[in-house]
Swiss-Prot record:
The keyword Cell cycle is annotated on this UniProt entry: no
Annotated SUPFAM superfamilies: Coiled-coil domain of nucleotide exchange factor GrpE, Head domain of nucleotide exchange factor GrpE
One Gene Ontology molecular-function label: protein homodimerization activity
Record organism: Mycoplasma genitalium (strain ATCC 33530 / DSM 19775 / NCTC 10195 / G37) (Mycoplasmoides genitalium)
Protein name from the UniProt record: Protein GrpE
Domain of life per record: Bacteria
PANTHER family: GRPE PROTEIN, GRPE PROTEIN HOMOLOG, MITOCHONDRIAL
Protein's GO biological process: protein folding
InterPro entries, per database record: GrpE (IPR000740), GrpE_coiled_coil (IPR013805), GrpE_head (IPR009012)
Keyword flag Chaperone: yes
Function of the protein: Participates actively in the response to hyperosmotic and heat shock by preventing the aggregation of stress-denatured proteins, in association with DnaK and GrpE. It is the nucleotide exchange factor for DnaK and may function as a thermosensor. Unfolded proteins bind initially to DnaJ; upon interaction with the DnaJ-bound protein, DnaK hydrolyzes its bound ATP, resulting in the formation of a stable complex. GrpE releases ADP from DnaK; ATP binding to DnaK triggers the release of the substrate protein, thus completing the reaction cycle.
Amino acid sequence: MCEKSQTIKELLNAIRTLVVKNNKAKVSMIEKELLAFVSELDKKFKQQLNNFNELQQKIPLLQKANEEFALKFERMQREAQNQIQAKLDELNLKNKKELEQAKKYAIAKTLDQPLNIIDQFEIALSYAQKDPQVKNYTTGFTMVLDAFSRWLEANGVTKIKIEPGMEFDEKIMSALELVDSNLAKNKVVRVSKSGYKLYDKVIRFASVFVSKGNKKS
């Protein structure tokens, strides 16, 4: 810009030399106009230069802000992906457990008939102790009953062990009737029908008679 100003000034001097003798006032007016124009150009140039310098100073800050934003976005994206994957894993695990549970307890729907057969054999064995004619079949009944019991156990089915004198437990027992007994109140007097569990789930409550606890010996 300084070189341009110098060139214009030289031009002004040349013009002044050529026409100074004829029209000094006109030369002075032109000179003022040119000088004002040069001054305005110089101001604009300096302003643009200042703007450029300010922009250059801001570039590192903008670059840093851009890098920080990129890192933040990458971190947010990674966290979102991890959360989505964790949710998918949770759903898959839940579905897997539900499927395993369904398979585990699917046999429960088919157990009514085998359990009823076992009930009949247990009744027959109890009568065998009283009836000599039936007692001859005890060995055969016992073998069949044992075979059924082993098959049930192999499939996760176990008989709930209940003995007379035990406390009545509504979680595994169903009370058929309250009866007079020498046993304390709420004690099991007799088991009418055995209860069973499939793994840890009760699939049939034991039917029992429960003591009123009011009979004196």
